[in-house]
């Protein structure tokens, strides 16, 4: 049929598994611009007219015809076509005609990615014509020419058939054209030359036509890291495995900030080159079905991997070497699987235990520098039962798909299945190899569910040379392939295929979109283990919290409850139980303010001293004799012990002429504060007679005043006959208090308080304490 002719143009005749060079047949018939010059004086338009007449005679062949056809892929829904030698200058006196057909009832949309045809003769000899229909009944849509012509508007046909005619005469410049087409409902059609710079949105979806694997284009990057912004979108989509070169398809693009470096890799017959810093990059949104299926991770067990034969031999050191099927695990150290025989009937088979969705395959060679073996081309077969096998083909193509393999012994090469394979068994059949058949494999895909199941590939019946009839059937009962144990004799190098001179270096291809699929047991363990860990952790936390709460409750019940204590009084009592700071015994004498003490009677003072221990003299606890350090009556320095503030023991306003703390006297001789002398022997309420006591430090030559118990406190008189006063006395007083009124032998102010006033003062003093 004529609809298959474009595929013949896109795929030249080739050997087993050899990659096709686009439009090789058309290029072979191309006359050079300089090899066949026109005779002098003859009309230069005579040759194109003869070629046009030849095309009319060959119309029944369909597809593309002529010597002016360039890169061409005409698919059932979309395609791409270029003039010969594009993007370089097309030759003189060439002609090409393309016949495009889509499904009946559909219309065709044509869009130009580049148009550069010389118009020096006003489209007389150099032009491009588009017709509705095919054959003699076709009608012209338009005739186009011009250098750098911007054809932003697409051209639409009236029916499902279109003819495109390119004609060139004598010209000096012009690249020709590149055009893409699709059915009319693909409104977001783009051409194979579009890049992200043609779009302003950070995310968008477009339709790529078939045939965007351009021989002259270049991409940089890989999936999933991203592609450089200069890369053509559709060609990068073929490399990533999201669209097919034969079918085209929809792509979803996400633009992000660029990176300083872009990796190189080989995938789907597209080699991406190393790229450097760019302003932006783009990635593809995919279904996520690109995880590894278990060859590398070990989810696929050794008995599930079989082969037609295995290479086993004993080397000159007597060591046995076995390159069996289970060694064909990608990225596993050690030797690969290698076939004992070297023919096209060898295979490596993988059993997935159940049907899965297989979207790709990654292969590598022997990975051993001393054994440079690899498979350069192979077929892929699939089966549901391991008995009836189907060779993978692309939709609409009546030939087996030959996948490009490795070009060296250590680089990974990825190939994607578009559409994906739904099967349990996968078999790899090498058709070309270097020296020996040796490879490591990993399958890409995901779990398959019956909901939304894709139809299986059902290519047309094969002829008599079907691989199914010539390939050994696997022994599923034993689960192992036959082994050959005889010693391998070295073969001469002239019997081996010649290694290609040109090699393409590709880095490791990483497909990390989806985690590897696992079996039911592994999936069950992956669910149960986290649940058990969380349950045990919760139980331990509950026990720890209960133990902590119980201990805290016990401590709370045993603690002292002091809600009614006054904070200042409680702290003063606690200070007596704490060791005092060691201070120098020879402190500077201080003046002690007795303005408030003068208002207290002997009974009141005795009560206060019984309720609150002395501030400056610490009693001995439990009758133990010890040395108590002296307390200082100086005003504490600011900033020192900021967290502690000692309350005023009298807690009453002071007269303005005095300080809140005792201040040192500016005298040379030693002075001491007036002692507080108590005579408890005559107190009516006292049950035990107490001698007179003093809480102040004695002179330096006297024994320490606080050695022993409270029964040995010192006292002294208020006599001041010497030239220097030994105790501080108030100045400016008019009269002194009588001994009958006060027990303390201290100076008093001129104004005496009445008995009622003193009682009120003492009540306020007790309330503050």
UniProtKB/Swiss-Prot annotation:
Residues 289-446 form the F5/8 type C domain. Residues 1-63 form the signal peptide. Its main location: membrane. Keywords: Disulfide bond, Glycoprotein, Membrane, Phosphoprotein, Signal, Transmembrane, Transmembrane helix. It is a single-pass type I membrane protein. It comes from the Eukaryota. The modification Phosphoserine is found at residue 601. Residues 1-26, 455-512, 718-740 are annotated as: Disordered. PROSITE patterns: CUB, FA58C_1, FA58C_3, LCCL. Residues 69-184 form the CUB domain. Residues 184-282 form the LCCL domain. The chain crosses the membrane at residues 524-544. The keyword Transmembrane helix applies. Pfam families: CUB, F5_F8_type_C, LCCL. Glycans are attached at residues 92, 152, 269, 469, 511. Gene3D superfamilies: Galactose-binding domain-like, LCCL-like domain, Spermadhesin, CUB domain. This is Discoidin, CUB and LCCL domain-containing protein 2.
């Amino acid at each position: 049929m004529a609809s298959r002719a474009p595929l013949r143009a896109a795929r030249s005749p080739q050997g087993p598994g050899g990659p096709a060079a686009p439009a090789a047949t058309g290029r072979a018939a191309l006359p050079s611009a300089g090899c066949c010059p026109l005779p002098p004086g003859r009309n230069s338009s005579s040759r194109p007219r003869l070629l046009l007449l030849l095309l009319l005679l060959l119309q029944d062949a369909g597809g593309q015809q002529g010597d002016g056809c360039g890169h061409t892929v005409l698919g059932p829904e979309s395609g791409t076509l270029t003039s010969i030698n594009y993007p370089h200058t097309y030759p003189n006196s060439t002609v090409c005609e393309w016949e495009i057909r889509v499904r009946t009832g559909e219309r065709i949309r044509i869009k130009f990615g580049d148009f550069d045809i010389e118009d020096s003769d006003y489209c007389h000899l150099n032009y491009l014509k588009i017709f509705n229909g095919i054959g003699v009944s076709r009608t012209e849509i338009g005739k186009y020419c011009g250098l750098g012509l911007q054809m932003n508007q697409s051209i639409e046909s009236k029916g499902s058939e279109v003819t495109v005619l390119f004609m060139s005469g004598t010209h000096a410049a012009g690249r020709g054209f590149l055009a893409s087409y699709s059915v009319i409902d693909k409104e977001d059609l783009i051409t194979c030359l579009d890049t992200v710079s043609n779009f302003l949105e950070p995310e968008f979806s477009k339709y790529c036509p078939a045939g965007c694997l351009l021989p002259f284009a270049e991409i940089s990057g890989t999936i999933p890291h991203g592609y450089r912004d200069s890369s053509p979108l559709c060609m990068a989509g073929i490399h990533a495995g999201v669209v097919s070169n034969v079918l085209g398809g929809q792509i979803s693009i996400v633009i992000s900030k660029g990176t300083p470096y872009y990796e190189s890799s080989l995938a789907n017959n597209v080699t991406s080159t190393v790229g450097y810093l760019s302003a932006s990059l783009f990635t593809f949104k995919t279904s996520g079905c690109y995880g590894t299926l278990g060859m590398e991770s070990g989810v696929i067990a050794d008995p599930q991997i079989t082969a037609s034969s295995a290479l086993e031999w004993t080397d000159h050191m007597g060591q046995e070497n076995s390159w069996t099927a289970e060694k064909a695990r990608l990225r596993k150290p050690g030797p690969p699987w290698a076939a004992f025989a070297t023919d096209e009937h060898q295979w490596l088979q993988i059993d997935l235990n159940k049907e899965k969705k297989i979207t790709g395959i990654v292969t590598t060679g022997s990975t051993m520098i001393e054994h440079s073996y690899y498979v350069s081309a192979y077929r892929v077969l699939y089966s549901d039962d391991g008995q009836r096998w189907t060779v993978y083909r692309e939709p609409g193509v009546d030939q087996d798909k030959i996948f490009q393999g490795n070009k060296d012994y250590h680089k990974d090469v990825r190939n994607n299945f578009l559409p994906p394979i739904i099967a349990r068994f996968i078999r790899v059949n090498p058709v070309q190899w270097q020296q020996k058949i040796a490879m490591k494999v990993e399958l890409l895909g995901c779990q398959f569910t019956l909901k939304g199941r894709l139809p299986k590939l059902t290519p047309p019946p094969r002829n008599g040379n079907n691989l199914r009839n010539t390939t050994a059937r696997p022994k599923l009962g034993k689960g192992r392939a036959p082994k050959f144990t005889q010693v391998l004799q070295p073969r001469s190098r002239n019997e081996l295929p010649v290694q290609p001179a040109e090699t393409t270096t590709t880095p490791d291809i990483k497909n990390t979109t989806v985690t590897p699929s696992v079996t039911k047991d592994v999936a069950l363990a992956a669910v149960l283990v986290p649940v058990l860990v969380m349950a045990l952790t919760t139980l331990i936390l509950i026990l720890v919290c209960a133990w902590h709460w119980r201990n805290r409750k016990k401590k709370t019940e045993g603690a002292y409850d002091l809600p009614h204590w006054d904070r200042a009084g409680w702290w003063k009592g606690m200070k007596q139980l704490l060791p005092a700071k060691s201070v120098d015994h020879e402190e500077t004498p201080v003046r002690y303010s007795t303005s408030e003490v003068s208002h207290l009677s002997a009974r009141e003072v005795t009560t206060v001293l019984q309720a609150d221990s002395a501030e400056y003299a610490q009693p001995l606890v439990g009758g133990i004799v010890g040395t108590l350090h002296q307390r200082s009556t100086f005003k504490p320095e600011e900033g020192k012990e900021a967290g502690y503030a000692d309350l005023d023991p009298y807690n009453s306003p002071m007269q303005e002429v005095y300080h809140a703390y005792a201040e040192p006297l500016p005298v040379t001789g030693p002075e001491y504060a007036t002692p507080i002398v108590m005579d408890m022997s005559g107190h009516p309420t006292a049950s035990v007679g107490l001698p007179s006591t003093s809480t102040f430090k004695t002179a330096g030559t006297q024994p320490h005043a606080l050695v022993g118990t409270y029964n040995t406190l010192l006292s002294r008189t208020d006599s001041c006959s010497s030239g220097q006063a030994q105790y501080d006395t108030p100045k400016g007083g008019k009269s002194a208090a009588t001994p009958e009124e006060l027990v303390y032998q201290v100076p008093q102010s001129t104004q005496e308080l009445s008995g009622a006033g003193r009682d009120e003062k003492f009540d306020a003093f007790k309330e503050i304490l």
